[in-house]
């Protein structure tokens, strides 16, 4: 099963981002309420539903790490994601940026920066999530390497 939650509003704000504060409060409040609810709701095969569910929070694109001249942030090819729940190796950050704030190559098994690694993309995360859900990723994302660093062994 899959559920998707959207917080309405104009998120694509290149200036005056303070107008997004209520949206962030709504989003993180809803996320907090969801996690709390999962932690006290009986699961189907485990004691609590949080032990059966994976929650992913991300956007389809990133934002520049520095402010632009209009007090906002522009589109950026690097994005962050929060992944929590069953089967996920949590409590850490993966990847890195260089001094110019450009994403570095990553070892897909450890999640650490590596000169011999590859650039991490949303498709690599998608393959890992499909594997976590017991779905063969080759059917949907053939030839894409899995970002296994997020998977609990």
For the regions a language model picked out, list residue spans one by one.
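Short coil-to-beta-strand
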Residues: 1-8
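Feature marks hydrolase-like catalytic cores characterized by long aromatic- and Gly/Pro-rich stretches
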Residues: 10-153
């Amino acid at each position: 099963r899959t559920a998707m939650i959207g917080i309405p509003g104009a998120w694509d704000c290149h200036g005056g981002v303070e107008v997004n504060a209520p949206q962030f409060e709504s989003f993180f409040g809803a996320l907090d309420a969801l996690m709390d609810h999962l932690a006290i709701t009986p699961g189907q095969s485990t004691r609590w539903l949080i032990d059966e569910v994976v929650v992913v929070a991300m956007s389809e694109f990133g934002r520049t790490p520095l402010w632009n001249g209009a007090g906002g942030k522009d589109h950026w090819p690097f994005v962050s994601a929060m992944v929590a729940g069953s089967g996920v190796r949590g409590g850490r950050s993966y990847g890195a940026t260089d001094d110019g704030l450009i994403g570095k190559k990553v070892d897909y098994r450890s999640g650490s920066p590596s000169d011999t690694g590859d650039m991490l993309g949303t498709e690599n995360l998608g393959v890992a999530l499909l594997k976590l859900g017991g779905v063969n990723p080759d059917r949907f994302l053939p030839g894409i390497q899995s970002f296994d660093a997020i998977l609990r062994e």
